[in-house]
Amino acid sequence: MSKLKELPLSALQFYATAPYACSYLDGRLARSQVATPAHLINADVYSKLVRAGFRRSGIFTYRPHCDDCHACTPCRVVVDQYSPSRAQRRAAERHQGLEALVAPLTYVEEHYQLYLLYQSVRHAGGGMDHDSRDQYEQFLLQSRVNSRLVEFREPPESPSAGKLRMVSMIDVLEDGLSSVYTFYDPIEQKASYGTYNVLWQIAQAQALDLPYVYLGYWIEQSRKMAYKALFQPLELLVNGEWRRFEDVVPRTTEE
């Protein structure tokens, strides 16, 4: 069930926000459709909302609802058919030694400092590079659904033993994992932490016998979001139906 009217969510209400500056496409205005009240959105309800194209930021559950733009397309990797590209295999080999620790959503000062470093280097001037601790916690550590925090560190035998390299927030859904947000050490120029994180989530979904990894929105015109098409096979939510990427976007995305 993908269409909102088909979902058993009669207790929820949905409203459209006022226009605001789009964070993905310069010069565009965006709007969101927000699901309320937040306390009714438990793990089961949220799983259904994600299948209908919603995402969350803290306890704020939304999906794009723009007046004249449909660039944001929900996407998910088909786990049991996933086949890594050559570049993805290299990323897996490069970072396979990282040790992953799965934990509840918890504030750790070291995580927060890495988050600030990541924002200042990768998204300078984007408005999040000076987030306070409260803003960080509201964005990433508040959740009413089945959420996990995963930290990735260098192994004991590494010259940088124990060094924190990456932190990822993940939601566990009925039919998959949903990648909420990931930040990593931006100083390592040759690293492929972001790619490795998606590969790790795909492997976890396979181990849990979950069919999908939801990657949020694919935006062809946005360099920050277009990379998701590199993880194939990918499905896109178009007009309420999940369809294969190649059926919607016939040309091949360059790696």
Curated annotation (Swiss-Prot):
It is found in: Cytoplasm. The gene is bpt. Its EC number is 2.3.2.29. NCBIfam families: PRK01305.1-1 (NF002341), PRK01305.1-3 (NF002342), PRK01305.2-3 (NF002346). InterPro entries: Acyl_CoA_acyltransferase, Asp_Glu_LeuTrfase, N-end_Aminoacyl_Trfase, N-end_Aminoacyl_Trfase_C, N-end_Aminoacyl_Trfase_N. Transmembrane segments: none annotated. GO terms for molecular function: arginyl-tRNA--protein transferase activity; leucyl-tRNA--protein transferase activity. This is Aspartate/glutamate leucyltransferase. Keywords: Acyltransferase, Cytoplasm, Transferase. It comes from Ralstonia pickettii (strain 12J). It is an enzyme of class 2 (transferase). Functions in the N-end rule pathway of protein degradation where it conjugates Leu from its aminoacyl-tRNA to the N-termini of proteins containing an N-terminal aspartate or glutamate. SUPFAM superfamilies: Acyl-CoA N-acyltransferases (Nat) (SSF55729). One of its GO terms (biological process) is ubiquitin-dependent protein catabolic process via the N-end rule pathway.
